[in-house]
A protein has these predicted regions:
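Cleft-lining beta-strand/loop regions that shape enzyme active-site pockets
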Residues: 36-39, 47-48, 64, 93-270, ...
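Conserved PDZ fold ligand-binding element
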Residues: 34-42, 59-64, 117, 137-144, ...
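Bacterial N-terminal signal peptides
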Residues: 9-19
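Bacterial N-terminal signal peptides that target proteins for export
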Residues: 1-9
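PDZ-domain C-terminal substructure recognizer with occasional recognition of PDZ-binding tails
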Residues: 66-90, 388-412, 474-529
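Boundary at the C-terminal end of the N-terminal hydrophobic targeting segment
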Residues: 21-23
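PDZ/PDZ-like peptide-tail recognition elements
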Residues: 91-110, 396-446, 450, 534-539
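Amphipathic alpha-helical substructures
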Residues: 42-80, 363-410
């Protein structure tokens, strides 16, 4: 994307699509970018009364066959129509500018001591501010540009010049309307009880009072504008106060006021639309009206139609009036429609699904810069697949394949056609991948364990007649993951899931190499994490405490510290998922007196001029401990199962106390789980926040790194040993010595 500044406009080019797009695809991608930008920022979409999904579906049929600018223009017109945006302009036309020299005189005297001030954007700025002569009894300001302002002058400089003149024409402070922008932050967290960060809404910027200049006089004032530049906010305030009258001359396009943004569908096909609003102090939005409208006439100076119209307005006393204003905007929460009635959506709706997934991640996925693959190319590939999919399952698989490219272990894709309501049972096993082979790390189903059919250290070589390496590779290709270890972990878990009532035949190899086959019955899944071993959740042995954070509950934290208070060291086992104990734990460990332990980043989509592509940063705070601090040595066990809340807990402990991490890198996927719902009730989950260490180091796709690397071995599994825990104990013995 290329951004070119145009004063109050931002031009967003789409050239980066072209290299990957095939014939006919560039126009679809250009329309997708327009749909995405409007969806994220246009003020008309705040109230939820416009079906923006359906608007894209209505526009897409214009784009059949080869790329064609007329078709693309027609698609853009159809797409933007529901917005009823008075600022909308589609297509470039050669602008007609006022005919006045770049270095022409600023002041021209008209009859009746009327000062015509040529403040045309595009004129060379004078070294000193213009001082209105005492002779002036009436004033006309001609603010129409004489040149394209994209590259000529700074909008800020133009405002300074205008304000210096207006300050000489007011006798009390003037309050211009303030710019107000809509911003969006993407879908809400999957768990409605979670902290959401900043929710979508409006951001109103400050405005600045215009103060009278020394010796200012309240003179009759008329202002000439046209359709080439937005009407300045200060002029609108003067009109509202009855202190100015406005003449506009315009052609097919109407004059406008308020923030604008421009997105270029092609080099010569811009779409310009509202970037926000101007708001009065009561919250209502400006809807400006000229005191007189004229047909397009770019002439200026004495005898020109616009100047004559301004003189006619000055001949009669202006009335104080209040131009029409729109009611204050009232943004409403908008959740994605599920479209459950279209299990296998028609082609246009399938295209919408791919575009919506792309747009959501393009705007709101905070770790997009860390992806290995081009997200634009992922969209192209998915759009091509949408042409050929034959049923709801193939449709879901196409979206799943696209989402995999996000490289985020939180990412998952689910729908009925993909079997999310069918795989309700699983084999009660913990698996480990060692040197490319899959081994039983533990049997968690008591019935299966009692049967003796499987033992820790057994190699699984086949499942239901399929070679396990083949099955695992196939499943791994469907897994989005922050790290390769995380990809294999997710694939191995998926490998143990089955529908209810199934019988599963496993081919096994024991330590002696003897092959055997066993048949097992998957059991109903629940949310309980399997026990790693028979150790108590909290124990102390020879001065070293052990705490299983999978089992520790929030209400048990203080009692746990009371139990271990006399230990010289503690091993926290975080090779699983905690129960919301992170802050309570870190507070009692905070010998470093840390005030915060992590920073979370949330994407903020808003118009370019208001801060396009901004990120919000939040510090996770640590508060004073409710009890005595634990000052012993701290070790934490981690591995690829340490994900999300578990990683957050690790960051909290890391900030609070000198901790030694033992094990293998964590999953590298932290940040609350969010979801986008696509046509056909397809859900895609992803990390809604990017979380970093307190010192700013990356966590996403990196994970918490162990100080001491330790991993299970095949021999250790077969001997029933927990080698990671053993390594931690060994470290503490060495440290004691």
């Amino acid at each position: 994307m290329v951004v070119r500044s145009r004063g109050v406009c931002a031009a967003l080019a789409l050239w980066w699509f072209s290299s990957a797009a095939q014939a006919g695809e560039h126009d679809v991608l250009a329309l997708a970018r327009l749909w995405s930008e409007v969806r994220a920022t246009h003020p008309a979409l705040a109230a939820g009364t416009i079906d923006w999904d359906r608007a894209l579906v209505a526009a897409l049929p214009h784009l059949e066959g080869e790329d064609n600018q007329n078709s693309l223009r027609a698609a853009a017109v159809t797409l933007m129509a529901p917005l009823h945006d008075d600022a909308l302009r589609i297509g470039a036309s050669m602008p007609a500018f006022v005919r006045w020299p770049v270095d022409g005189a600023v002041l021209e005297w008209l009859p009746g001591d009327t000062a015509l001030l040529h403040l045309h954007p595009g004129m060379r700025a004078a070294a000193a501010p213009f001082v209105l002569p005492v002779r002036a009894r009436r004033v006309i300001l001609d603010l129409r540009p004489i040149a394209d302002m994209s590259y000529m002058s700074s909008p800020a400089m133009l405002q300074v010049s205008l304000h210096s003149v207006l300050a000489q024409l007011i006798v009390r402070p003037l309050l211009p309307p303030a710019p107000r922008y809509r911003f969006s932050t993407g879908p809400r967290p999957q768990d409605g009880g979670q902290w959401e960060g900043v929710v979508p809404g409006f951001m109103q910027m400050e405005t600045q009072s215009l103060l009278p200049a020394p010796g200012a006089r309240c003179l009759p004032l008329a202002v000439i504008v046209n359709d080439a530049q937005p009407v300045p906010a200060a002029v609108l305030a003067l009109q509202r106060a009855g202190r100015a009258q406005i003449v506009t001359e315009e052609g097919v396009r109407r004059s406008r006021a308020g923030p604008l943004q421009t997105l270029w569908l092609e080099d010569d096909l811009p779409v310009e639309f509202s970037a926000g609003q101007l708001a009065w102090p009561d919250g209502s939005a400006v809807r400006w009206q000229a005191d007189q409208r004229l047909p397009q006439d770019r002439a200026t100076g004495q005898g020109s139609a616009p100047v004559m119209a301004a003189l006619a307005l000055l001949a009669r006393k202006p009335k104080r009036h209040k131009p029409a204003a729109s009611p204050a905007m009232y943004p409403l929460r908008q959740d994605d429609a599920a479209y459950r009635d279209m299990r296998f959506p028609p082609r246009a709706w399938r295209m919408l699904a791919a575009i919506k997934l792309w747009a959501t991640m393009d705007k709101y996925f905070p770790a997009r810069r860390l992806m290995d693959h081009s997200w634009e190319e992922a969209l192209l590939a998915c759009l091509r697949r949408m042409e050929d999919v034959r049923d709801a399952r193939e449709y879901g698989l196409a979206l799943e394949a696209m989402a995999v490219q996000l490289d985020d272990s939180h990412v998952g894709t689910g729908s009925r056609a993909l079997g999310w309501n069918e795989r309700t049972h699983g084999i009660g096993l913990r698996l480990a991948r060692i040197d490319g082979r899959v081994y039983v790390a533990g049997v968690t189903d008591p019935v299966l364990e009692g049967s003796g059919l499987l033992r820790a250290g057994d190699e699984i070589t086949g499942i239901d007649g399929e070679d396990v390496s083949t099955r695992l590779a196939r499943l791994a290709g469907k897994m989005a993951a922050s790290t390769e270890a995380g990809r294999w972990r997710k694939a191995m878990f998926e490998m143990t899931l089955f529908s209810g009532g199934a019988s599963v035949r496993l081919r096994l190899a024991a330590a002696d190499g003897v092959q055997r086959s066993v048949t097992v019955q998957p059991t109903s899944l629940d949310n309980a994490l399997p026990l790693r071993h028979a150790l108590p959740a909290v124990s102390v042995d020879e001065g070293v405490a052990y705490v299983d954070l999978d089992r520790l509950q929030p209400g048990e934290v203080d009692a746990m510290f009371a139990t271990i208070k006399d230990s010289r060291a503690v091993i926290f086992d975080m090779r699983g998922y905690p129960n919301g104990t992170g802050r309570a734990l870190a507070r009692r460990l905070n010998v470093r007196h840390a005030a915060s332990f992590a920073t979370s980043y949330q994407q903020l989509a808003m118009p370019y001029e208001a801060g396009h592509g901004a990120q919000l940063a939040y510090e996770d705070r640590l508060f004073p401990a409710p009890g005595p601090l634990y000052r012993g040595k701290v070790v934490m066990l981690i591995d690829e199962h340490t994900q999300s809340q578990a990683e957050h807990l690790a960051l909290a402990v890391e900030a609070a106390t000198p901790v030694t991490f033992v094990g293998t890198p964590s999953a590298g996927a932290n940040g609350d789980l969010r979801e986008v719902v696509l046509p056909g009730n397809v859900h895609v989950w992803y990390s809604g926040l990017e979380v970093r260490h307190a010192d700013g180091r990356e966590l996403q796709r990196v994970g918490v790194q162990p100080h001491i690397l330790a991993a299970p071995t095949v021999a250790g599994l077969r001997a029933g040993r927990d080698e990671v825990l053993e390594r931690a104990r060994q470290f503490l013995r060495q440290d004691q010595g």
